[in-house]
Amino acid sequence: MVRHRDEEEEDARHAAFIRNIMVGREGLTRSVLLEATARAGGRLPRSYLSTGNITFTTPVANVDRVRRALEDAVRVSSGRREPVFLRSINELRGLAQRDSFGSDPYSPVHERCITFLPDGTEWIDPLPESSTRNDVELIDATDRAVFSVTRLVGGRPGTAGPLVEQRLGVEVTTRNWNTIARILANPL
């Protein structure tokens, strides 16, 4: 197949996962995030839920510009710096095909989750690994994500983010797998 444009110029659909925010708090609205995405060249931006999940289309070469625009919008609105984790929709589809939760010997499960790692960070320790409270179990990992299940212990669910951050020494963001399924069901 002959390409008429460089791979870097080809449009792709991406998802942005913003760490540690709730849309509607601290002046951070959906419109602020969608407008920041559009101003940076992200076309057809769409917001999912209230936890900072945005999809958009842009050339691969422009992805970092959109990331910076979203990080700036969060900083201006909330006064905090929070990282944005970008993944292509194709990468998310590959993660879904991996079927990390498929054999599910992890019952009873409260949530199935995915934790996104910053670029250049990789989970290399053996899995599965459980938290000291046994409310989180890390079950699978790729070069840019860790899959986990959470359980209710003492009436409270665990969350994988703090465990992964402690082990790797980096900031991460975690999403319920249902959020990823929702994005993949309708990424436009």
Regions found by a protein language model. Give the residues of each.
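Surface-exposed, charge/polar-rich loops and edge strands
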Residues: 2, 10-188
